[in-house]
């Protein structure tokens, strides 16, 4: 029996904003498989690799993990400030080198990730959705700038952070 069921509580609702390299791939699959979490959306952001590559990785991971009924959207293709630094030596040319991934398991929504985040936050009860950025924080910053009236509706932000300075040191 899950912790949520034992405590008679609802799963925590999350939006996963990611740049799937190896770490984010694990985070996505764990979020989907965890009965204490309700994955409301997956958004991608340029980070470990280009937006095109990390989005393709996220779509392939949806197939691998059997993720269904969750909207996916691509977001920011570059950082807000400075050039994008791609650590090919860490995550490889694809951003997820190693496994041979299948073709996309889900179609992308016809909207920008920032707008999908806003739609989900607006649709759900205030204070019930946690943002979980595991990559660059560009989409989260753009969400706060574009939709300041929705920021107070966010339950919180749980992030996997890096460092200021050279990427992936």
Predicted regions and their residues:
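Acidic, polar-rich low-complexity tracts and alpha-helical solenoid repeat scaffolds
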Residues: 4-5, 72
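Active-site histidine-anchored catalytic micro-motif
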Residues: 7-18, 22-60, 67, 94, ...
């Amino acid at each position: 029996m899950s912790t949520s069921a034992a405590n008679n509580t609802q799963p925590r609702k999350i939006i996963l904003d990611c740049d799937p390299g190896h770490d984010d791939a694990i985070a996505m699959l764990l979020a989907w498989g965890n009965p204490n979490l309700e994955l409301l959306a997956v958004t991608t952001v340029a980070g470990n690799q280009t937006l095109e590559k990390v989005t393709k990785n996220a779509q392939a991971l949806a197939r691998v993990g059997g993720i269904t009924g969750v909207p996916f959207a691509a977001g920011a293709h570059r950082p807000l400030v400075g050039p994008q630094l791609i650590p090919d030596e860490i995550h490889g040319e694809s951003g997820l080198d190693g496994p041979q991934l299948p073709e996309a398991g889900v179609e992308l929504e016809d909207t920008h990730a920032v707008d999908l985040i806003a739609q989900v936050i607006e649709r759900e009860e205030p204070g019930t959705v946690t943002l979980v950025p595991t990559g660059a924080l560009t989409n989260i910053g753009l969400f706060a700038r574009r939709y300041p009236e929705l920021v107070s509706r966010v339950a919180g932000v749980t992030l996997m952070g890096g460092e200021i300075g050279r990427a992936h040191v």
